Amino acid sequence: MISWNRIKHFTRDEFQDPLHGPESGDLINGEFLFMIVRLRIDTGWQIAIHWKVGGAVDVDGSHGHAKKSYHLKDQGCKAIDFHFLTDAPINQQFWEIAHAGFTGIGFYPQQNVPGWHIDNRPREESFIWKFVNGKYDYFLS
């Protein structure tokens, strides 16, 4: 169980499935949460998680994620969609994410605020991708 009073920069609510209440934020994977906190501390950039649209924990697949998405409870809840609150160039943002050790990295440049997907999938399944004009372009890492 995560001791949220000991977590800096984030609250349980920021990871919740909006259809299942704040307590669903407890499902976020602890190791993954540690990596997100480290990313926030190392960069100094605030991280705005897109939890209100299912961009963190997805308890039952109600938010349109792929069947094996790492957002899903069945896959360990080790993914978020977010954007940084920074003016840093996208290339620098990518470098910081990759340097932090995330093994699934997606870039969504056409959102209202260009944003990211990060997850902690097994290394042998590592992927980097971008989503442009309704199409995913995948790159092996």
Where are these regions (language model features)?
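Active-site acidic/histidine clusters and adjacent loop/turn architecture
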Residues: 1-46
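Alpha-helix initiation/capping motif
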Residues: 11, 22, 29-30, 55, ...
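Solvent-exposed, flexible loop/coil residues
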Residues: 14, 63, 109
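Feature targets compositionally biased, intrinsically disordered low-complexity regions
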Residues: 20, 53-54, 60-63, 100-105, ...
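Extended, low-complexity, intrinsically disordered C-terminal regulatory tails
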Residues: 31-67
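Catalytic cores and adjacent binding grooves of peptidoglycan-active enzymes
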Residues: 68-80, 84-141
